[in-house]
């Protein structure tokens, strides 16, 4: 597990702990959230506990909660790949659509990028987003992400559910981003 502790203004971004599992599960099942991918297979709290243990034992994965004034407003799960250049892959991004405005989410993403660079030397960032989730796509695009590729998924109920990989390659313009 990558250890993450970031606090600024009224935002705190920290690792999920075992005692958070039940609250996290019910947040994931709530319809007040916006998620980067439409499909989440968990149906029981015990399945999330298994996911938690897997992340906890892995040295390159992270599963973090985003708190705003002590309210749980978001979750991010992903992994780091340490190669040249180092990368972060955000595989699950959930945000409460009512607690924070989009501009605050821009700041959260930006501050996480800086944190990952300073703590772990991460230069490049990738996120997978469902092509129908235009709001999340725009949040990441306004943060300097661009479309890298599109994965065509099987149609479900005649709806195209392709996944888009957005990327931000900071190693190309490192001086621009960190000064």
Positions of PLM-derived features:
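Short acidic N-proximal helix/loop "leader" segments that mark the beginning
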Residues: 1-8
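A short beta-loop-alpha structural element at the N-terminal edge
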Residues: 10-26
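Acetyl-CoA-dependent GNAT
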Residues: 18, 29-32, 41-100
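Alpha-helical elements of Rossmann-like donor-binding domains used by nucleotide-donor carbohydrate transfer enzymes
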Residues: 23-26, 47-51, 107, 111-115
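Conserved acetyl-CoA-binding loop-helix of GNAT-fold acetyltransferases
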Residues: 101-115, 138, 142
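Conserved GNAT acetyl-CoA-binding A-motif
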Residues: 117-128
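Conserved catalytic-core motifs of GNAT/GCN5-like acyltransferases
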Residues: 128-129, 144-162
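C-terminal "cap" of GNAT-fold acetyltransferases
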Residues: 153-179
């Amino acid at each position: 597990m990558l250890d993450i502790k970031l606090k600024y203004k009224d935002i705190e971004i920290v690792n999920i702990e075992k005692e958070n599992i039940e609250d996290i599960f019910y947040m994931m099942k709530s319809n007040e959230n916006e998620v980067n991918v439409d499909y989440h297979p968990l149906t029981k709290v015990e399945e999330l506990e298994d996911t938690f243990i897997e992340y906890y034992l892995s040295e390159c994965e992270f599963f973090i909660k985003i708190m705003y004034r002590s309210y749980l407003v978001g979750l991010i799960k992903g992994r780091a790949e340490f190669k040249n250049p180092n990368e972060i892959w955000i595989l699950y991004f959930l945000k409460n659509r009512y607690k924070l405005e989009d501009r605050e989410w821009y700041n959260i993403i930006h501050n996480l990028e800086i944190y990952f660079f300073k703590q772990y030397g991460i230069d490049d960032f990738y996120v997978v987003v469902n092509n129908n989730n235009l709001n999340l796509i725009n949040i990441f695009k306004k943060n300097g992400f661009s479309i890298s590729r599109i994965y065509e998924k099987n149609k479900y109920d005649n709806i195209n559910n392709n996944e888009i990989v957005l990327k931000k390659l900071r190693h190309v313009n490192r001086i621009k981003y960190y000064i």
